[in-house]
Amino acid sequence: MGAQRASMQRPAADTPDGFGVAVVREEGRWRCSPMGPKALTSLRAAETELRELRSAGAVFGLLDVDDEFFVIVRPAPSGTRLLLSDATAALDYDIAAEVLDNLDAEIDPEDLEDADPFEEGDLGLLSDIGLPEAVLGVILDETDLYADEQLGRIAREMGFADQLSAVIDRLGR
């Protein structure tokens, strides 16, 4: 979801603009660190990078892809929990299509072409660490916000906005 900044879509094979940030909550403190560029093009790469953090606390990734949409990735022993902010992005971005595949979302590509942006996935994936499902739903409904702005709002709601901003600043965004 989110407003579109680019006037033309970037082919799925290109490395998109954007950022990936790993977020860790340990002993009541938030820590954010940049993720590698492969996290924006491969769900498997994002999952692997997050799992390698090996934290005793909560770990999740925030992926902003071309400021068009975002993905939240939360690995767990029972399987990775996912949220895609705009399922229609699967038409143009491999990582969005990969998320839909992992969610077993059976959405016909023809249906996506005519659809308004809509989220797909687990709205409750952050509810145990401070972001109620209803609040995340409200953020996703704010279609006038770009993906990075929606992620900033999530960070503010959860209490790690300063840490997220510091990482994004270091990335030159």
Swiss-Prot record:
Database matches in InterPro entries: tRNA_Adeno_NH3ase_assoc_put (IPR023869)
Protein name: Protein Rv3753c
Provenance organism: Mycobacterium tuberculosis (strain ATCC 25618 / H37Rv)
